[in-house]
């Protein structure tokens, strides 16, 4: 299952291992279209192999700004 992170927990949740970060927003159509694909991927791959996290850019602008996110969806 994908994990939702916020600015306050981002560093802690992404500090170890291989992490795929999904920068998204609730109003973003393409973000909503790719969400089921990322969810399926998270179910097929163990968290030890790849951790998938989501961060809402509207509610967590600090992290989005830190990574220079200019458009969404963006995967890092």
Q: What positions do the PLM features span?
A:
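Structural microenvironment flanking redox-active thiols in thiol-disulfide oxidoreductases
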Residues: 47, 55-64
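The canonical Cys-X-X-Cys-His
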Residues: 28-31, 75
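Typically the conserved alpha-helix immediately C-terminal to a functionally engaged Cys/Sec
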Residues: 32-46
């Amino acid at each position: 299952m994908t994990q939702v992170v916020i600015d306050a927990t981002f560093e802690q949740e992404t500090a170890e291992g291989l992490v795929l970060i999904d920068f998204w927003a609730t109003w973003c159509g393409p973000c909503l279209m790719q969400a089921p694909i990322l969810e399926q991927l998270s179910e097929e791959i163990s968290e030890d192999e790849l951790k998938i996290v989501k961060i809402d850019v509207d509610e967590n602008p600090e992290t989005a700004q830190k990574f220079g996110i200019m458009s969404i969806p963006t995967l890092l």
